[in-house]
A protein has these predicted regions:
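The feature marks the mature, well-folded catalytic cores of soluble enzymes
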Residues: 1-122
Length: 124
């Protein structure tokens, strides 16, 4: 099993106000979301991940989605300038964490890291 590092951040108290177009958005259950996040972290561990947990940002509802703020490729961590203004304050703690792990590169606007797909481990 290959090992890898996964950065995670549990949902903060404001998570029920996260940006969403889902019709049941008003029914977000914070306790359930936190339990689901713990299950996600456990699945990552079972897959061989070393977990680096970033503390929750209670004032930033979407901050649990760390994959949007940055992505790592080889020896660099690419920091994404998020288009959604309400999410830009998430970057400070992400950048601080990643600087201890990789050389960071600030990308020009706009890119969500969740839009990146690394296919380097796929052999065709």
């Amino acid at each position: 099993m290959r090992s890898f590092t996964a950065f995670v951040r549990p949902p903060g108290v404001s998570f029920p106000q996260a940006i969403s177009s889902h019709p049941a958005k008003e029914e977000i259950d914070l306790s359930r979301a936190r339990e689901q996040h713990r299950s996600y972290v456990n699945a990552l561990k079972k897959a061989g991940a070393k977990i680096l947990a970033i503390p929750p940002e209670d004032s930033l509802p979407d901050s649990t989605f760390v994959e949007d703020t940055a992505f790592v490729f080889e020896d660099r961590a690419f920091l994404c300038f998020l288009k959604e203004e309400t999410r830009r304050n998430e970057m400070e703690s992400i950048e601080k964490t990643l600087k201890g792990y990789r050389k960071t590169v600030n990308l020009p606007p706009y890119l969500d890291g969740g839009d990146i797909l690394d296919l380097s481990l796929i052999h065709i």
